[in-house]
Amino acid sequence: MSSTPHDPFYSSPFGPFYRRHAPYMVQPEYRIYEMNKRLQTRTEDSDNLWWDAFATEFFEDDATLTLSFCLEDGPKRYTIGRTLIPRYFSTVFEGGVTDLYYILKHSKESYHNSSITVDCDQCTMVTQHGKPMFTKVCTEGRLILEFTFDDLMRIKTWHFTIRQYRELLPRSILAMHAQDPQVLEQLSKNITRMGLTNFTLNYLRLCVILEPMQELMSRHKTYNLSPRDCLKTCLFQKWQRMVAPPAEPTRQTTTKRRKRKNSTNNASNSNAGNNATSAYNRKKVPAASLNLSNQVPFPTTKKCIGDKTRVRRNYRGIRNGLDVMVVGEPTLMGGEFGDEDERLITRLENTQYDAANGMDDEEDFNSSPALGNNSPWNSKPPPNAETKSDNPTQQASQ
């Protein structure tokens, strides 16, 4: 029995160590883990360029960061933009924090067309303080993150709602200063407010003023204007936006389409024709009383036989009030024709019906599929009906 060479890179799926062959998409929660690792690589010499690079890596250009918590004087809510986010993280470490990381438990992810939302109701922001005494602060709350659905997967919105916080001290420190009441009193005081240092809180209060001034600062850097001129320009543009009427939505130009006549018109025309025919059968009046040309327009052609001229109707169904379709030019490349592209079809007004000249068309007319079985045109005229004149033009002149 020949033995096959053993593959050192082969891993059985049923073995204790299963190797994943295809890499999966990076989970949004893993981005928080990467952000924690990046914060751990921070040094004391990290300048503004390092913090700008940090914010560019994990936050979108139009990202916003919101903090909500409740202080002694009431609830607070601070929202800062992308330009102020790097400074926010730097103030955390400038306030005496030596380490910062976030822990997410039981987070829920929801995928949308262009974003991924992570909702974690049990988020803990852990900060370690070295001054005045080693203290570990655990700030608990709800963190809602919105990531972009792309390869970078950067944060668009960051909303952290703080519920409670705890400040933890090592037992060894308490045992060392157990006999010193002044030190114990100092250790019993909180070093943070809702898990945030006074340095960070002061910066958030300053952001209330700085955030509306971002437009002035960017205009000053772009156009090199004085602060007073920047303020005048911004106020004038804001006034223009308030005074300007709302823009109307653009309407798409639609080409004209040919429409068939309404069914109500067809029904009225049919009723008019039936009423005229019943009156003809009842009173035995000439067929000239039924003027079809005034009810339904139709195209006609002339046919000359000797010195007599008669009219032959091209569409048999129009005598019963049916629709008349207009012949259009062939459509090229999906184009549509409007009113100016239609053929000009002329017609001849015929005020009376010539029964003598229509004898040769009677058979074809009665067998037309456009007529129904109960149509009055299929019934034979009464034997004692009056004979019409051969020349319709003479009767029209009378």
UniProtKB/Swiss-Prot annotation:
Chain intervals with Low complexity compositional bias: 263-279
Region (Disordered): 245-280, 354-398
Pfam families: LID, LIM_bind
LIM interaction domain (LID) domain residues: 323-362
Annotated keywords: Nucleus
Tissue: Expressed in adult brain, lung, spleen and kidney. Isoform b is generally expressed at a higher level than isoform a.
Localisation per UniProt entry: Nucleus
Molecular function GO terms recorded: LIM domain binding; transcription coregulator activity
GO cellular component: nucleus; transcription regulator complex
InterPro entries tied to this protein: LID, LIM-bd/SEUSS
The keyword Nucleus is annotated on this UniProt entry: yes
One GO process term, biological-process aspect: negative regulation of transcription by RNA polymerase II
Keyword Ribosomal protein included in the entry's annotation: no
UniProt cross-references to PANTHER family, sorted A to Z: LIM DOMAIN-BINDING PROTEIN (PTHR10378)
Family: Belongs to the LDB family.
Function: Binds to the LIM domain of a wide variety of LIM domain-containing transcription factors.
Protein name: LIM domain-binding protein 2
Gene name as annotated: ldb2
